[in-house]
């Protein structure tokens, strides 16, 4: 699993990019906007980019 108990990332560079349930760590890709996230990020419920949430 890319992100442990919280599900996979959006993108190919999982592993060190993601915390188990919190916001993604840096180094894999940016958040480009509320609903447009870079590799290894997903859109969270409040418009930020988080690990383990589905895209909006």
UniProtKB/Swiss-Prot annotation:
One Pfam family, short name? Mst87F
Repeat recorded as keyword: yes
Protein family (similarity comment): Belongs to the MST(3)CGP family.
GO terms for CC?
sperm flagellum
Name the encoding gene, please: Mst87F
The reported effect of residue 16 to A is:
In strain: MEL01
Swiss-Prot/TrEMBL GO biological process terms: cell differentiation; spermatogenesis
Q: Identify a single GO molecular function assigned to this protein.
A: structural molecule activity
InterPro entries from the xrefs?
A: Mst87F (IPR055083)
> Which tissues express it?
Testis.
Q: Which UniProt keywords apply?
A: Developmental protein, Differentiation, Repeat, Spermatogenesis
Know anything about its domains from the record? Answer: This protein is mostly composed of repetitive C-G-P motifs.
The name on file for this protein is Male-specific sperm protein Mst87F
**Keyword Repeat attributed:** yes
């Amino acid at each position: 699993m890319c992100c442990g108990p919280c599900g996979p990332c959006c993108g190919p560079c999982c592993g060190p990019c993601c915390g188990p349930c919190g916001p993604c760590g840096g180094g894999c890709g940016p958040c480009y906007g509320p609903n447009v996230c870079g590799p290894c990020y997903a859109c969270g419920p409040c418009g930020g980019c988080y690990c383990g949430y589905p895209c909006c």
